[in-house]
Amino acid sequence: PALGGTCTNVGCIPSKALLQSSEHFDQANHHFADHGIEMKGVSMDLAKMIARKDTVVKQNNDGILYLLKKNKVSFFHGRAAFSKAVEGGYEVTVTGTANEVLVGKNIIVATGSNARALPGTPFDEINVLSNDGALKVGTVPKKLVLIGSGVIGLEMGSVWRRLGSEVTILEGLPTFLGAVDEQIAKEAKKAFDKQGLKIELGDKVGEIQ
């Protein structure tokens, strides 16, 4: 666990780092020639891409810690549990690198989120991946199916499509990006179609075998 929650560690920050790397690769392979820039023998080092992504995440973690210190906010690394009610509020025990007992009158519980597996599709992080596993893939998969057209799924679909995967996105709703403006969703789908993502709407996922 690290500062920043899902977005910083296993969400939009690392996915956008990989988006940038994959975009550079795609530009070098398919678009630089249009500008008179000829490149031969363009290769990809996925391990370096992943390492750069991890560096970007670490820089964000460090930046958050700096802001906490700058604003005199104490940070304790560990797992917290309410112990009892005491005069002045509640006692919280923190178990971690150093055990601490804290007391607060007002306490905000912000535990973050975990990926939710669908019935019949448990994560094994080998064949069925959560967002965390999808950000750590060591080789470019030949084929990749993404369940749901959420933000992270679409970003990771773009990444792996640019790097050579055949990507299919299964969306249970009958419309693409149903929660956003209809015209924006229409233009976004055009862009993803142009990238080569295959988007199937109204598909429900059963058991994966």
Where are these regions (language model features)?
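Alpha-helical macromolecular-interaction surfaces
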Residues: 155, 162, 186-187, 194
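Rossmann-like NAD(P)H-binding beta-loop-alpha module
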Residues: 138-175, 179-180
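Glycine-rich flavin
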Residues: 1-140, 168, 173-177, 183-184, ...
